[in-house]
Amino acid sequence: MAEPVLVVGLGNPGPQYATTRHNIGFMVADVLADRMGETFKVHKKSGAEVTTGRLAGRPVVLAKPRVYMNESGRQVGPLAKFYSIAPTDVVIIHDELDIDFGRIRLKAGGGVAGHNGLRSVGSALSTNDFQRVRVGIGRPPGQKSGASFVLEPFNSRERPELGTIIEQAADATELLIELGIEPAQNTVHAWS
């Protein structure tokens, strides 16, 4: 039987953040839960919203932390431990300033590029050797700080494309689970 995968969409809890750029990981996780035919419930040991099922033929634990982005590791670490999932079988879905809006990139290991949610996860897992589905949100215009940009809703130019991008990020996540990092990168990175 295939080993389980922990897939975590990063974001901030609360309705005031639901449509912000930083919450694209939550948006993708919601699509994946729909594809699995499952709903999220609070996991007592970790405090995260969790559902279990199968994606791409593998058992999956799908989660959305219920703490602020910068503290995500507080719930991801206990989930990985509870389900006995190795860091290399953890997939984090997150927003990425350094990638143009709408582009999706897959990565395994490496630095966190100033993303405090990833830093928190790496600290909790004692390694950065987890996999990532990086959903491009682009850089802020002008002199606007990245910190304020990620907490803003998608603008009127971006919103019409958002549904397609979220579906593609969910597709990319399933390919990563099914094929592994390099074959999935070859496919996903050719999309744009």
From Swiss-Prot:
GO molecular function: peptidyl-tRNA hydrolase activity; tRNA binding
Example GO BP: rescue of stalled ribosome
Site (described: Stabilizes the basic form of H active site to accept a proton): 95
Cross-referenced CDD domains: PTH (cd00462)
Catalytic activity: an N-acyl-L-alpha-aminoacyl-tRNA + H2O = an N-acyl-L-amino acid + a tRNA + H(+)
Pfam families, alphabetized: Pept_tRNA_hydro
Keywords: Cytoplasm, Hydrolase, RNA-binding, tRNA-binding
Domain of life: Bacteria
Annotated active site: 22
One Gene Ontology term, aspect cellular component: cytoplasm
Compartments in which it is found: Cytoplasm
Annotated site, Discriminates between blocked and unblocked aminoacyl-tRNA, chain positions: 12
Residues binding tRNA: 17, 68, 70, 116
InterPro entries (UniProt xref): Pept_tRNA_hydro (IPR001328), Pept_tRNA_hydro_CS (IPR018171), Pept_tRNA_hydro_sf (IPR036416)
EC number: 3.1.1.29
SUPFAM superfamilies from the UniProt entry: Peptidyl-tRNA hydrolase-like
Function: Hydrolyzes ribosome-free peptidyl-tRNAs (with 1 or more amino acids incorporated), which drop off the ribosome during protein synthesis, or as a result of ribosome stalling.
NCBIfam families xrefs: pth (TIGR00447)
Family: Belongs to the PTH family.
Assembly and interaction partners: Monomer.
Protein name: Peptidyl-tRNA hydrolase
Species the sequence originates in: Mycolicibacterium gilvum (strain PYR-GCK)
